[in-house]
Amino acid sequence: MRKLLPFIGNPHGSGRSALTCRYRCGDACFHEVPNTSDNEYVGDVIARAYSRRAMLRSAAVVTVATAAGSAVAFGGPGQTANATPSADAAAAGAGKGGEAARGLRFKAVAPNTDDKVTIPEGHEQNLVIRWGDPIVKGAPGFNPDKQTAAAQAGQFGYNNDFLSLLPLGGDYERQQLLVANHEYTDENLMFKAYDANNPTREQVEIAWAAHGLSVVAVQEDHRSGKLTAISRHQLNRRLHTTSEFRLTGPAAGGALLKTSVDPTGTKVLGTLNNCAGGTTPWGTTLHGEENFNQYFANAGQVTDPTQAARLKRYGVTSGATERKWERFDKRFDVAQEPNESHRFGWVVELDPYDPNSVPRKRTALGRFKHEAAQPRLTEDGRPVVYMGDDERFDYFYKFVSSKQMKKGNSRAAKEHNLTLLDEGTLYVAKLTGDSPAAELDGTGKLPHDGEFDGSGVWIKLATGNVSHVEGMTAEEVYVFTRLAADKVGATKMDRPEDVEPSPRTGRVYIALTNNTDRGKPGKEGATEANPRNLNKHGQILELAENFDDPAGDGFAWRLFLVAGDPNDPATYFAGFPKDKVSPISCPDNVAFDPHGNLWISTDGNQLGSHDGLFGVATAGERRGELKQFLTVPRGAETCGPLIQDKRVLVSVQHPGEIDGASVEKPQSVWPDGPGKIVRPAVVSVWRKDGRNIGVCPDQLTRGGVSRETPPRASTSLNRHIVLNSPPVSCPREAGASSPRPRRARWRTPPRSPARPPAPSRW
């Protein structure tokens, strides 16, 4: 019998180092949970559904009760409870029999603790760009011993996260624009002899300049997936803590967003803690402001009880902040500038093609710890944006625009599309288990039918200037969205981070990273959607909108993956044999490849190995087959995955961020080797033979040129984005188990005029 992999974590049950916790999120998990509402916890929801199934099975009931008017049904065999788990087979790329899913045909990387980026056999990699590399005209080369704020303002920022690539097209066919978030700074790894209690103004201003966003043109290699940054390109740009941003939408200009410096309530300096994001169909990028609360000081000095409660709900620092920015700019002191923190925690929209544009913070999408924001379109062309609030026991949301996207690259279309995220309806999710509570011990033990699932509804919070929450104005709903969601009874989740709709099926996948507070005394226990107490490893929830209508108000849900050591009975991989998958812990970011496979990056692996990037099939016979594609260096996190036909792009964030590390005592030598300062960077990975990632051999022509790569459109420099690339298909191969993925087990009946949409059950 195989042993479980070791649990590695800090005293609070996190796989991150204390250094990462301190600088990334202000030790969020060491503070009290901000959500003190009595709203239902998703673990309780799961528990009821499981208990109900157990009772039905014990009574020999073999049919699943389905609500009248169900919009989505769910069937098919689940994972058997007695599956023999093994993490070892994953390293050999073993599977159910036959080939792996298309796009995942590579030899899986074994878990390891190597201080490098480890990639599959037959692949190559290169550094695309690193912290400090000059990107704008006049920026000097990186010299950590002579760094200045002015230099950093023209160089690639620190701790890159979300990545997007937007093609330029036309005469610049082999060039793309790389857009990157810079989430946070770790001054211990940036400055020699750094004194956290007494930072200098120069150090603080360098850190201000190292936050924010970067736009960098990159050159493609026509024979491989290699990318090379084009320094000082005309479209290159840095946005940081002192750059101008504009507040737009229904809350802009309101009293809650006005400050002594900005009496209009529409202009704000900077963007902070940008984590993940999204790329819109109209060619802009979205950027989530996540742990912004840690930058604001002295909430404990606020005496007004209403204001104090609002600050507490958002976790604003009670005393001095870790970075001490409030010493150098009073706007970071809420006792002196009470509304400044309200101007952070939004989704930022950027037009990368216009270096003179002012990025916009979209208030219609609500204010909370935005991990990401990824849109899809309704059938009539209205954007729907899914979002998670990365906090223990908080919620996930969606925004449905009231406007339709205009196609084309005309000025009129561009101007119209830049208003799409200012008008619409903001919703929060409430999940329901399909059965009453009966038995759940918090271990995550699967029910006899092998699935955690249920139904849900989207609850309206606000539409334009109209509030749907009793006792709150529309402005209050947008600025204090968490409090609005508390009032309407949204379901508490286990740190909902990245949320991505599949471009192939429309199903939505939500990364729930972990929650080690679940089940502790005084805290909510396990529920159906979060079935484990002291949840160290996290899970991924799959959501199907009723009638495949993203603008609707009902959905079905189920857990697609329950992470951890496959030897652990509490883990689950969508019914795929657990002895054929890679171990995974703490899913964070998610992305899709052109084949419809889900790719997952991890943050805070608690299984004793480094964080990594994983691919998993979401449909067909291989559904649930999880394979590790790469691992990152010591102390690093994998984030910002971007999967294209010929390359995999990732951010390697905070390498060497291990307790006790400093510039003088580095804990990693990546990426430049011994004697060099450790630098976060972007890495591109491709196949040595130049062929597409993870495809079948007979799909390719001679010379490594792929037939399935869609042709590039010839467009102007100012606007080009490929929408809805055709799915990649693979001819039947000898030994393959099926010529095409079979349909997923969710069944969506056609809409009937006599049967209106209703919450789904299965």
Show where each model-derived region lies.
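Beta-propeller blade signature
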Residues: H211-V218, R343-P352, F399-V400, N535-N546, ...
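Signature of short aromatic-glycine-proline-rich micro-motifs recurring in repeat-based ectodomains
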Residues: A151-L165, P263-A276, K487-D498, F576-A591, ...
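Loop/turn-rich, solvent-exposed surfaces of beta-rich toroidal or solenoidal domains
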Residues: D579-A619
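Blade-edge beta-strand/turn elements of extracellular beta-propeller
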Residues: D114-R130, G138-A153, R223-G265, V348-R367, ...
